[in-house]
């Protein structure tokens, strides 16, 4: 007789089938290349009307701000500018404003649109008061707009930040800082709330990053779920990363794409996945990464996934990192696909 834990496990055959469905062995080069003095990061792609949009992060040497680009074919992108700026001086998010749309339709063969709640379209964002690249501590904010077309007019929630590493109920794995979120609607409420928020965070010992979860019924008030992370890798006492989760629903299986670093041999940062039937118990893929460093433009890192399927082709955008002659990082957004484009 199977135990309850064994029933939650995803079989090796199913894991292999998911890998074959989502793999993207063909690299198509840079989708958005950085200009001098900037680094680009963390793509989110969705459809509205007849156009595709990409929300991405721009680092200008001071901190993060959130930008937008558009495309008609998912390959050529035109920048539209900044849509979510840093907060006012003296505010908790005065130096960092890394936002991403929430409630994306997760269906693998779905329309890849944004779903509204309470008549609004939502974003989660990480914010911070200190200059620099992801300087601790970072906390979580919420913002909304009245329609996807209002991408330049987002209202910050007055009760921000909604999740902080200093919260009394923060768990050990999130005591240093909180990073990127992916929020999914769960009609079954299998985790205890209508909305489930997966996010990576760092502990205060080795700054090891793992992925945990929180739930909400209104997108504003969040309750942490569980005593620890749902995805973790590597030695708990050594720095490593399991980060930037995003989720799709492939038939009856939830698939979490995320990136790993410093726990899988000597390769640089890479993208992989895990699977679940209930959003709480996850089986990690132990095989070949979905993308990993292999080209001059991603020689250091190929990480931070955004994956979707459209017209039978799987598209996998990621942050590609290399270094120039003086050792400085070059960060842009690259694309890999399931078919040779």
Can you say where each PLM-predicted feature lies in the sequence?
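Conserved GNAT-family N-acetyltransferase fold
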Residues: 245
């Amino acid at each position: 007789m199977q135990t309850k834990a064994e029933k939650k496990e995803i079989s090796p055959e199913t894991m292999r089938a998911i890998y074959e469905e989502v793999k993207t062995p063909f690299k198509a080069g840079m989708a958005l290349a950085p200009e001098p003095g900037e680094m680009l990061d963390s793509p989110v792609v969705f459809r509205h009307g007849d156009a595709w949009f990409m929300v991405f992060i721009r680092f200008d040497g001071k901190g993060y701000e959130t930008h937008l680009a558009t495309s008609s074919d998912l390959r050529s992108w035109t920048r539209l500018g900044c849509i979510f700026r840093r907060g006012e001086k003296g505010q908790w998010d005065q130096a960092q404003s890394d936002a991403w749309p929430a409630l994306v339709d997760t269906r693998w063969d779905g329309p890849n649109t944004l779903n509204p709640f309470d008549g609004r379209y939502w974003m989660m964002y990480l914010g911070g008061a200190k200059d620099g690249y992801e300087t601790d501590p970072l906390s979580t904010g919420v913002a909304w707009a009245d329609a996807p077309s209002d991408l330049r007019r987002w209202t910050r929630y007055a009760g921000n930040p909604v999740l902080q590493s200093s919260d009394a109920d923060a768990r050990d794995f999130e005591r240093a800082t909180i990073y990127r979120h992916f929020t999914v609607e769960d009609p079954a409420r299998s985790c205890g709330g209508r909305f489930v928020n997966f996010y990576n965070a760092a502990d205060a010992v080795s700054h090891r990053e793992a992925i945990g979860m929180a739930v909400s019924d209104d997108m504003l008030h969040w309750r942490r779920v569980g005593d620890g992370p749902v995805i973790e890798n590597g030695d708990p006492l050594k720095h490593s990363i399991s980060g930037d989760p995003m989720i799709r629903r492939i038939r009856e299986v939830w698939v979490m794409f995320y990136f790993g670093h410093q726990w899988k041999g000597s390769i640089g940062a890479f993208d992989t996945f895990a699977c679940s039937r209930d959003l709480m118990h996850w089986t990690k893929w132990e095989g070949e990464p979905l993308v990993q460093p292999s080209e001059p433009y991603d020689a250091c890192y190929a990480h931070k996934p955004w994956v979707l399927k459209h017209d039978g082709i799987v598209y996998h955008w990621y942050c590609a990192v290399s270094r120039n002659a003086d050792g400085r990082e070059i960060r842009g957004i690259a694309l890999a696909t399931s078919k040779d484009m």
